[in-house]
């Protein structure tokens, strides 16, 4: 399959998943904090850590699978630009500390999620 088409299919699925999670989070958790962006960034970090660890250590993801899942799906599912603008808006609307909580939370929890994803991939492989 054409590599551009693989990226486009993955991106369409990732963007729709991101949108649905954003709507769900806004309805369920409220609009006082960018919960949707936080959730997709953490989940995306976890899945990326899992896929890249499993894909390089055991499964050997094909170039096509990486284009579809990593570049396409996760590239459109997670977002840095929304995170930056939402952090700026939080600073303006709710103060510096709320904004810093968002910045620190996305970075620290995202990193932790990537580490946990990698650990899960190793566990799935039987490598502990």
PLM features: what roles do these ranges have?
Residues 1-128:
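Membrane-interface helix-loop junctions in multi-pass transporters/channels
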């Amino acid at each position: 399959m054409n590599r551009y088409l693989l990226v486009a299919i993955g991106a369409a699925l990732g963007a729709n998943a991101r949108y649905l999670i954003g709507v769900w989070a806004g309805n369920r958790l409220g609009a006082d904090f960018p919960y949707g962006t936080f959730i997709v960034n953490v989940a995306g970090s976890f899945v990326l850590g899992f896929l890249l660890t499993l894909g390089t250590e055991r499964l050997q993801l094909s170039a096509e699978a990486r284009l579809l899942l990593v570049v396409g799906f996760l590239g459109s599912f997670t977002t840095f630009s929304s995170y930056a603008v939402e952090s700026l808006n939080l600073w303006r609307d709710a103060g510096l500390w709320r904004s810093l909580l968002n910045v620190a939370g996305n970075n620290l929890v995202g990193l932790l999620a990537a580490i946990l994803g990698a650990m899960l991939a190793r566990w799935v492989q039987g490598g502990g």
